[in-house]
Design a protein with these regions (language model features):
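Conserved beta-strand-loop-alpha-helix junction that forms the acyl-donor binding cleft
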Residues: 92, 118-127, 232, 261-272, ...
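A short beta-loop-alpha structural element at the N-terminal edge
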Residues: 3-17, 163-176
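Conserved acetyl-CoA-binding loop-helix of GNAT-fold acetyltransferases
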Residues: 87, 93-106, 133, 230, ...
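Conserved GNAT-fold acetyl-CoA-binding loop/helix
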Residues: 23-45, 177-200
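A short helix-loop-beta-strand connector motif used in the catalytic cores of GNAT acetyltransferases and
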Residues: 43-58, 67, 81, 195-205, ...
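Conserved GNAT acetyl-CoA-binding A-motif
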Residues: 108-121, 251-263
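A short, internal acetyl-CoA/4′-phosphopantetheine-binding micro-motif in the GNAT/acyltransferase core
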Residues: 72, 83-92, 120, 228-236, ...
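Conserved catalytic-core motifs of GNAT/GCN5-like acyltransferases
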Residues: 119-121, 137-151, 263, 281-293
Length: 293
């Protein structure tokens, strides 16, 4: 018998264990969630606009949570981000993953999302088949996911001559959007997300003689580094590594101890080398999928 219900606060320890279990096994890895600590889970969900219980789901058997799934749908965004589905090993083979996925898609549709984006570990063949059977299409190239512990960071001491790094403000919206669209022409972050990030003080800009050269956004709730981008004329000049290093140092002044993640195209060799030099450790490689609604 299937017992699907909304996610509750009391479910967090069990869901965290499902996340840890999957992350430790390449054939079971998913792009969401990547929680390894209760603090990471609490921080991310606390920042959601809607109650997580409205769009996240668990499967309960005899009082125990044995499956997890759902979506995040944020105001102003056209897509929903898929979480899971994750199923405890002893309960697999009962179509629980399919059920969780179908219910997740229904919640995305009910929230007005135009598509669902999912990511699966490159070796998670079962998860890939599940998505493809539900109509998801493979999207783009594989992404490498990294994590950085503050104690492992190797900062860049000296930046390119004449380049300054500062925290952006609401007045920098146009400049940040111009950098974003130039560096990420296929990016899906809406303007409202950039406006909110600038207002929250999580966006950093690199400039020279008043001209924007690079941008990066470090989200303290997701503990994630988004959109490290450098304009084409300044690439391979050390600007990207410098803005990232300065942004990280400033971030950790206010959030000491936070372990941060990021993802980058697995074939972007210059970026991979940059992250390795600064101490980032590889976590997993994921493939992206999309389901139009």
């Amino acid at each position: 018998m299937k017992n699907l219900r909304g996610f509750r606060r009391a479910d967090r320890p069990a869901v965290l264990e499902l996340s840890r279990h999957a992350l430790q096994r390449p054939t079971e890895q998913v792009g969401n969630p990547l929680w390894t600590t209760r603090d990471e889970l609490e921080s991310e969900l606390a920042d959601w606009d809607a109650d997580p219980g409205e769009t996240l789901l668990v499967e309960e058997q005899d009082g125990d949570v044995v499956g997890f799934g759902g979506v995040e749908v944020s105001p102003g965004w056209e897509h929903a981000d898929l979480f899971g589905p994750l199923v405890a090993p002893e309960f697999r083979g009962r179509q629980l993953g399919t059920m969780l996925l179908e219910a997740s898609i229904e919640r995305a549709e009910a929230r007005g999302a135009e598509s669902v984006l999912a990511s699966i570990g490159a070796r998670n063949l079962t998860g890939r088949l599940l998505l493809e059977r539900a109509g998801f299409d493979h999207r783009g190239t594989a992404n490498a996911v990294f994590r950085l512990n503050p104690s492992a960071h190797r900062p860049v001491e000296d930046g390119p001559q004449g380049v300054d790094v500062r925290r952006g403000s609401a007045d920098d919206l146009d400049a940040a959007l111009e950098l974003y669209h130039e560096c990420f022409p296929e990016g899906v972050f809406p303007d409202v997300a950039w406006r909110e990030s600038l207002e929250d003080g999580t966006v950093y800009l690199a400039e020279a003689k008043g001209k924007g050269l690079a941008v990066v956004n470090i989200d303290p709730s997701d503990r994630w580094i988004y959109h490290l981008g450098v304009i084409e004329s300044e690439r391979s000049h050390g600007v990207g590594g410098y803005v990232l290093s300065r942004a990280l140092q400033d971030y950790w002044d206010g959030h000491p101890g936070d372990v941060l993640g990021l993802s980058v195209r697995a074939d972007n060799l210059p970026a991979l080398r940059l992250y390795r030099r600064q101490g980032f450790a590889p976590l997993l490689v994921v493939e992206s999928f999309e389901l139009p609604l």
